[in-house]
Swiss-Prot record:
This is Glycine--tRNA ligase alpha subunit. Pfam families: tRNA-synt_2e. Keywords: Aminoacyl-tRNA synthetase, ATP-binding, Cytoplasm, Ligase, Nucleotide-binding, Protein biosynthesis. The lineage of its organism: Bacteria, Pseudomonadati, Pseudomonadota, Gammaproteobacteria, Alteromonadales. It comes from Psychromonas ingrahamii (strain DSM 17664 / CCUG 51855 / 37). Tetramer of two alpha and two beta subunits.
Length: 302
């Protein structure tokens, strides 16, 4: 077993990837689109649909425009990182595996206060919900743990287990720093490189874009066009490209929200429009996999 320097953000990610690879997960790459959470990645949203098994893990950059603070808040970012683990069907020892993963990154579970606090999860735009827990480490939420019950309006059978690590929060605890920007990303031949060195300017400028410069009219047009394109692609039987349009529409909506361009009443209407697209994608994807004979079911352990 290779040892990684989990006192760096880079080493923390490598250690988690190594641990979950040894548990049989496919280590896939981040989605190359703007999404608000790792759950949007097709490896979670689409692979939770239908009977086919899938164990995977990946880092996902997440964008939440309304959370930007111009780089002035030490704990809030408009772009941050999640480490996502998806286990389908969910193994009986999934909680034990999570606790072992904490040990691997240098957190002694025998001396720290680790609590599973009931917090059922829901994503209105994805038509998804699940039974879940927030996992608290010494009073700070660091992970969300969910058993998916429904995705895209479809019942999940078998149930998918999802573990979402908040990488920045865990790293702040492991490194003992009070600001995300003080996190050591890596410590190499050229010295220490911090999170702030890499991302602070991005937080300042992207916050300015999200709150001040994003073109509202263009975003409304983009949302409407993505909605139309997704519907056309569903009619053409192309669930995966249709889903990409759903994600683009969702990000346009999030930017409009940051620009305060949508009223409370309109907000719910837009959420329902994205939800309708997500459900159509889920049904189309299920139908396509069913027509293929659910090929990954051959990997189910008898």
């Amino acid at each position: 077993m290779q040892k990684f320097d989990t006192k760096t953000f880079q080493g923390l990610i490598l250690a988690l990837q190594d641990f979950w690879a040894r548990q049989g997960c496919a280590i896939v790459q981040p989605l190359d689109m703007e999404v608000g959470a790792g759950t949007f990645h097709p490896q979670t949203f689409l692979r939770s649909i239908g009977p086919e098994p899938m164990n995977s893990a990946y880092v996902q950059p997440c964008r939440r425009p309304t959370d930007g603070r111009y780089g002035e808040n030490p704990n809030r970012l408009q772009q941050y990182y999640q480490f996502q683990v998806v286990l389908k069907p969910s193994p009986k020892n999934i909680q034990d595996l999570y606790l072992k993963s904490l040990e691997e990154i240098g957190i002694d579970t025998s001396i720290h206060d680790i609590r599973f606090v009931e917090d059922n999860w829901e994503s209105p735009t994805l038509g998804a919900w699940g039974l879940g827990w927030e996992i608290w480490l010494n009073g700070m939420e660091v992970t969300q743990f969910t058993y998916f019950q429904q995705v895209g309006g479809l019942e999940c059978s078998p149930v998918t287990g999802e573990i979402t690590y908040g990488l920045e929060r865990i790293a702040m605890y492991v490194q003992g720093v009070e600001s995300i920007y003080d996190l050591v990303w890596t410590d190499g031949p050229m010295g220490k490189l911090t999170y702030g060195d890499i991302f602070h300017q991005n937080e300042v400028e992207q916050s300015s874009y999200n709150f001040e410069h994003a073109d509202v009219d263009a975003l409304f047009n983009q949302f409407n066009q993505c909605e139309k394109d997704s519907q056309k692609l569903i009619e053409a039987g192309l669930a995966l490209p249709a889903y990409e349009q759903v994600m683009k529409a969702s990000h346009a909506f999030n930017l409009l929200d940051a620009r305060h361009a949508i009223s409370v009443t309109e907000r719910q209407r837009y959420i329902l429009r994205v939800r309708a697209l997500s459900k159509a994608v889920a049904e189309a994807y299920y139908g396509k996999r069913e027509a293929l004979g659910f090929p990954l079911c051959k990997n189910l352990v008898k």
